[in-house]
Amino acid sequence: MQDYISEHLSEEITPADLAKVSSFSPWYARRLFIEHLGMTPAVYIRRLKLSKSALRLRDENVSVLDVATEMGFGSVDGYQRAFRREFGCNPKEYSTSPVPIWLFTPSLIIERERNDDNMSEIRNVFIQVIEKPARKVIIKRGIKATEYWSYCKEVGCDVWGLLTSIKSLSGEPVCLWLPEHLRKPITNEYVQGVEVEPDYDGTIPEGFEVIDLPASTYLLFRGEPFAEENYVSAITEIWDAEKKYDPAFIGYAWDDKNPRIQLEPRGERGYIELVPVKKI
């Protein structure tokens, strides 16, 4: 049902549509949706539409009327009221002067029955050298987090939505494993953040802070596209490749003074991590 909603978000989605795609009755499909996601399909669809529309208002030269119409809202007034309830600001004001807002980032519910052999065949890992410029990163620290799940337990899983609302230098938020000199407290290695220009002077959300990162060289490791339910295997595949790879082969050594970077695992592009290196 989530996949169907994502693929048909700009269209009218009815209970019958969700029932058909899930092969359940409309009543039971709705019940399952609420049980697993904590909200009705209608609320889920509205929140997702509002968040998608906010990104359009931030990034495109588009009117509030056009966005409201294209996202299927019955009237501009109705859209404006819904936008204000969701984000606490008027859509016109937001499009003129974007500020960080808590975008809706829904949890993806994966079927419990998985085939552990789905990714057992030989798969390629692509590696390339990239240069990242000097930049600031707006981050939200944890306490003892060392990976995604412990981070979510400490600070919540909604941070990503807020970071997504901030226009990023790299086009999307990032997760970082910080080197020791950037940790505070020292036990918190893993953080989420968004890379921005060195002269960024926009709003810093409450509870967030800014760190400065120098221009640096990275090895980008990217796996092949994967089915969403196989995301754990996709991540492990890249971690194994990183452990086995010797950057000295191309004249580099690992750099422990810059953070390792994790991009959002998206099946259609493959899992991606960036590991810092330096010239030998």
Set out the residue ranges of the language-model regions.
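Residue-level detection of beta-strand scaffold positions
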Residues: M1, R30, L37, R46-L48, ...
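Short hydrophobic/aromatic-rich motifs at helix boundaries and adjacent loops
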Residues: M1-D3, V21-W27, H36-L37, S51-S53, ...
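Short, charged N-terminal helix-start/capping segments
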Residues: M1-L9, D66, S150-V155, G207-E209
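Terminal helix-turn-helix DNA-binding modules in bacterial transcription factors
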Residues: D3-A16, I34-M71, P98-N118
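Sequence-specific DNA-binding recognition helix
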Residues: I13-F33, D59-S95
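A solvent-exposed interaction/effector surface
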Residues: S51, L55-R58, G74-I280
